[in-house]
Amino acid sequence: MGSLPPPSLDFSSIDHNSLKNGGSSHQEISHDNLLNLFKSQQDLLNHFFKHLDLSQTLDFSRILLSTTGTVFFTGVGKSAFVANKVSQTLVSLSFRSSFLSPLDALHGDIGALSPRDVLVFFSKSGATEELLRLVPCARAKGAFLVSLTSVSGNPLAGVCDMNVHLPLQRELCPFNLAPVTSTAIQMVFGDTIAVALMAARNLSKEEYAANHPAGRIGKSLIFKVKDVMKKQEELPVCKEGDLIMDQLVELTSKGCGCLLVVDEHSRLIGTFTDGDLRRTLKASGEAIFKLSVGEMCNRKPRTIGPETMAVEAMKKMESPPSPVQFLPVVNEDNTLIGIVTLHGLVSAGL
């Protein structure tokens, strides 16, 4: 076997100051230069908006809206990231959509395509070899093919059923190479189409929330009081005849800041808070040792039902005359079934 010649080690030409700065020379980014870059990018995006063919865009939107199958998106490199993102946006809006890798498609994944589907190609140049190889295979599956390109007369546009031209004056990159404007245009185009489809389908806020159960908007429209309340052994419960001093552990150990006073049938009588404890101690002194919870509790507390939306519980806590930190949860006959706390609502992401 052959071998590589030994390296020639010459350290005399090394710029040690350059090494300290990461191995390359840098210039400061000035305020004016940065501002000019943003203005230039704005001008490039304005060129896109000014020259976009709305008739092409409308036809494309209607095809996506009317498809009875799945809308697949594909691309290579940075365009692949855009294609994937736009696809996921549509999925979040209850549209059947998916990203199709052009490489994986040629190794089995193209089996997902059917004659009812639409395949959308994101490509700046329209000359990407991987996408051109995919076209005849996708056509054999019967899918409708759409290219979104920025170069006129490109080969991909010529072999697809439809092309939408995304006008691009140039890239912001000083070499006109890095796809920093073309991808922005692709993203703006894709997301705007997604919103147009959303409006055409009359997607409701409730449907949107159902697709985002972990997000704040989803939780606010899905979670009910019964989903976030404490219950059973978590409740700081006592009877009205119990002495205040005998219930200090119950008052302080359940993390609710209160006692829930109930009768023998678990119907709510009132509440006694840690604030009530401080006020009673200040007003009564040693007499507090003989006072029962029932004598000092609030017999008209705010309450809420288990089927009420959790976000409404938060509003009720914050309503006049003064905010509260908790709400006892009762059913129709005032039987205590839980407690919802402000801390619990915040922890749930509401």
From Swiss-Prot:
GO terms, biological process: carbohydrate derivative metabolic process; carbohydrate metabolic process
Residues binding ATP, per UniProt: 75-80
Residue span(s) of domain CBS: 229-288, 297-350
EC code: 5.3.1.13
Gene3D superfamilies xrefs: CBS-domain (3.10.580.10), Glucose-6-phosphate isomerase like protein, domain 1 (3.40.50.10490)
PROSITE patterns with a match to the protein in the record: CBS (PS51371), SIS (PS51464)
CDD domains in the cross-refs: CBS_pair_SIS_assoc, SIS_Kpsf
Domain of life of the organism encoding this protein: Eukaryota
List of residues binding substrate: 94-95, 107, 133-142, 167-169, 295
Keywords assigned by UniProt, alphabetized: ATP-binding, CBS domain, Isomerase, Lipopolysaccharide biosynthesis, Nucleotide-binding, Repeat
Domain SIS: 60-203
Site-annotated residues for Catalytically relevant: 78, 130, 171, 212
UniProt function note: Catalyzes the reversible aldol-ketol isomerization between D-ribulose 5-phosphate (Ru5P) and D-arabinose 5-phosphate (A5P).
Similarity remark: Belongs to the SIS family. GutQ/KpsF subfamily.
Name under which the protein is recorded: Probable arabinose 5-phosphate isomerase
